[in-house]
């Protein structure tokens, strides 16, 4: 109704578990099924365009778990979102700061840990942006430095993932 009134252009859903768990888990949701439901209710111009889920170097299921299915092909939630034209925002890029401690996150470039974490997430295919909780102005300034660094290209990113997961 609010879409018909022009008050809401697009909408989405945020979840902590539903897109990270396996199909056998009661909390599991299929993105393909959700998009189909949106089409049944709102037609092809349904407005369901975004999801938000946890993703970082510790919570890597969005990239590595093939727990979704699109056209009967097992894919990750990020692959599913790309195929279904759903934008992905991610949460907890630093795991409430735990990933920023020395030695916690794998080394893969010369960046400081916060920028390394943001670079990994924003270079992941299908991710629009990581959503970062920040309390201090100096953290905002530090995290904005990522804007001066180009994302990792797809081939290099896939090679990095292979290196980090082998």
Describe these PLM feature segments.
Residues 1-166:
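Beta/alpha (TIM)-barrel catalytic core signal, keyed to glycine-rich beta->alpha loops juxtaposed to Asp/Glu
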């Amino acid at each position: 109704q609010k879409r018909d009134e022009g008050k809401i252009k697009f909408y989405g859903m945020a979840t902590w578990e539903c897109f990270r768990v396996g199909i056998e888990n009661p909390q599991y949701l299929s993105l393909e099924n959700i998009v189909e439901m949106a089409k049944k209710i709102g037609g092809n111009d349904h407005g369901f365009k975004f999801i938000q889920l946890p993703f970082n170097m510790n919570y890597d299921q969005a990239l590595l778990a093939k727990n979704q299915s699109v056209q009967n092909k097992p894919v990750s939630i990020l692959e599913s979102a790309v195929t279904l034209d759903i934008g992905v925002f991610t949460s907890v890029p630093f795991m409430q700061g735990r990933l920023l401690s020395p030695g916690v996150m794998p080394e893969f470039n010369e960046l400081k840990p916060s920028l390394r974490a943001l670079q990994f997430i924003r270079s992941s295919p299908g991710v629009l942006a990581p959503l970062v909780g920040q309390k201090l102005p100096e953290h905002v300034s530090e995290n904005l430095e990522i804007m001066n660094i180009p994302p990792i290209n797809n081939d290099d990113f896939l090679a990095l993932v292979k290196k980090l997961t082998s």
